[in-house]
Structures are given as C-alpha cells and as structure tokens.
Amino acid sequence: MVKQKTIQSEITLKGVGLHTGKEVTMTFKPAPINNGFTFIRVDLEGQPIIEADANYVVNTQRGTNLEKLGVMIQTPEHVLAALVGCDLDNIIIELDASELPIMDGSSKHFVEAIEKVGLIDQDAEREVYVVKEVISYLDEATGSEITVIPSDEYSVTTMVDFGTKVLGTQNASMKSISEFKSEIASCRTFSFLHELEMLLEHGLIKGGDLNNAIVYVDKELSNETMEKLRVAFGKDEISITPNGVLDNLTLHYPNEAARHKLLDVVGDLALIGTKIKGKIIANKPGHFVNTQFAKKIAKIIKNEQRNNVPVYDLNKEPLMDIHKIMSMLPHRPPFLLVDRILSMTDTQVVGLKNVTMNEDFFIGHFPGAPVMPGVLIVEAMAQTGGILILSTVPDPENYLTYFMKIDNVKFKHKVLPGDTLIFKLELLSPIRRGICHMQGYAFANGKLVAEAELMAQIVKNQ
C-alpha cells in the first residue's frame, strides 16, 4: 500500500508571472489527506480556494488558466508538474497574485525547493486510477491527439513536429515518474520568433526575458525587430546562436522542446486529480488537448466511482447500530433515516437503511404505488454524512447539523418497499470550521439510484 505524501514544512518562492509581469509570492504548505492540490488567493477577500481541477479550465491560449467563481489561477502547469514529479499528493499553494511565478521557464526551482524541505508519508492510502483500456482524445482541428494505454506504471511519450527548419520533429520519453526530476524538470518553455512578436504586440509576455524562455528564430530577423526585442528585454545586444536560438542560452538537451512539452503534459494531467497508472502517448500536445484529455479521464473516473456499488456482508456486526447512531444524531423516528453505519474513515462513511412498507411516507406517496420520496433519499444521505462530520467532535450529542447547499442532485431509479439502501458519502474537501462538503451516492439492488453534492455545517446546540 502506497501512502499519500505531503511536504514536511512550508516553502516560499518569489518571482514574476510570465504573462502579467506581476511580482508574486508563492508558498507551498503541507495539506491534510485527500486534499489534493489546491490554490488559495491570499490577496483576495475571503482567501478563496481553487482546486486543481480540469473542470475549472477556461483558457489555454498561452498556458493553462483556471477560474472558479470569478477567481483566476494562471499558468499553474509548471508547478503542478513539479508536484507530480516529486511524488506528492497533497499541497496547499498560497498566492498573492493570479499568475504563478515563471522562474526560469521550467519546473527546476520548484523541484529543488520541495526537495530541500522533504516529504512525509500520511496516514491514508493513495488512490490510483488503473487504466484498463485504450482511451483517446483527438483535436480534429489541429490533429493533436493524446492516448493512454494500460501499463504497469505512469509513463509519458511526446511526439512533436513544428514544421520549421530550426525546430522540426522531436520526441521525448519518460519511462517512469522517477525520471522527472533528472530528465524533465529543467526543460524550459519556448516560443518561436513570430509568436514572440505577436505576444509582445498584445502585451501577453510582460514577465518574460531571454533567460526564462527559449526563443527559436524561425524567420529573418530585421533590424527593427531586433531593436524591439532589445527594448522589451532590456538588453544592449541580442544575438542568434548557431542552433537558431536567441541570445546566449545553452540548450540542456537537443530535444529540450519535446521534453518541455512532456513537462506540460504531466502538469496539465495533474488536473485529473488522481494518480494514473498507464502509458500516455501524446502526439503534438498542447494545453488545449492536454486539458480536454484530463477532463475526459476525470469524467470516466467519476462515472466509475459513482457506479462502484459498495459490497458488505449484512450479517456481519455493523460499525454502528441504531442505538449508537441515535447517540450521535439528534433525529428521531419517523425522521431517522439511517439504520446502520457499515464503515467509516476520515474521509468516507457508508451507511444503510432498510426501506419497509411501514414507513409513514408511503401512506401518501403514493396510495397503491408506494415510492420513497427523492428528497428523503437525499435527507438519508445527509444523515449518513452527518455521522462523519459529528465524529470529528468529542461531544457529538451537543451538536445539530444544518444543510447549507445541495447541488447536482440526480435520481436514477425508484426506491420501493423492501429495498435496502446503501449510502456512500465522500469528502470533496477537508472539514473546516465545522463545514463539510460531500459527494453522496445512494445504491439499491446493485444500482446507483441517486446522487447529490451536499454541504452541511454542525452547530453547537444552545
């Protein structure tokens, strides 16, 4: 069993954003189990949290950009690649600006900072999505395609063809994530001269200089363009090296461009939110196709999880019987809707309700055609989740649980007298200040019958 990992202590780095040119202070902090990678904008009121989630991707024009409730996180891919490459699971990233620091255009400085403080194992098993079949995403407009196939470990191969004399076809491979730090982390971002001119004209590369981005000269460099570049980068002289790169940068590898594309793939696929066991093959990758592929994989994982019916021996003694449940929950019949707690961890609880014809709600819902009301299925899920949140306080009998929000409720099948409902509630984020954000599933007869995203808070009974 592989344990989840976080860092042993805080790390702070300072730099500028590549596109905004704004100075930014970034602090990595240890995070609790199942936190994943989360960003906190400490410069904004309320210090909003943005999870590293592919569903928050809004723009991939010159990097990956996330947005949640109007709050932006710009170009996180190099940092995310470093976190994955260092084998981390849980990190909080505090920022006082929207864009992460570009540093030298690679993941090198982030990896070095993480290695300086070291990692620590956490008391929870790492979740890994094992690829069982070929999954692909094709961008028909560009011909870019990413495929994952079954493999014993996470590996990545990138194939790029830029169609220019100075930078043509290149390939790069990472056979194991253990190779990231030595073979991939130091590979810097790059651009072509014609792209650089466009970016400068539109003010999209304010934090760039010739030390944090490789510039390949794919066109004749006029005196006018040379002067613009001198002014933009504050250089007295700019030259072209024999290998077609601006200024005096030395390439770390002949295929550094392909290796950096691989770095971007690793960073963008971190937005899946789960470690992958499979071989990634990326043909002409870019941030758009990378993040679309991440969304596809994340959706597949979610669908598999929601259809994964918990299996329990109902003859076995439960973790909590009805008497133990009543000692924690304030609810009483006929509104006590969970009969047993079958299992519970720090982040998940599984409960059970036997649905019988004796339920009061069947009198009117519906005469002659009894169906359990959907709202009561959601209530039963919430009561099961309430056990999880109440287990975090020493005196649960002195607390009440209140709904704050219910989202994305779906009812799949009817629940009838004689059915046995099994509820699975999983934390979507760590419990903070008595607030619990959960994903709930209800199963009956081996099928998913309902699901909902729930947010609740426990309040001490006055």
What residue spans do the PLM features occupy?
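Non-catalytic linker/capping segments at the edges of enzyme domains
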Residues: 303-371, 398-400, 415-416, 428, ...
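Flexible glycine-rich active-site/ligand-binding loops centered on an Asp-His dyad
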Residues: 173-190, 372, 442-450, 454-462
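Extracellular/lumenal ectodomain signal focusing on beta-strand-rich modules
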Residues: 90, 279, 339-343, 408
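Active-site helix/loop of acyl-thioester processing domains in fatty-acid/polyketide metabolism
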Residues: 259-272, 341, 347, 371-396
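C-terminal regulatory domains involved in ligand/effector binding and gene-expression control
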Residues: 1-89, 94-312
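Residues located in well-ordered beta-strands
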Residues: 337-340, 405, 410, 424-426, ...
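Short Pro/Gly-enriched beta-strand edge/turn motifs at strand-loop
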Residues: 6-10, 319-325, 422-423
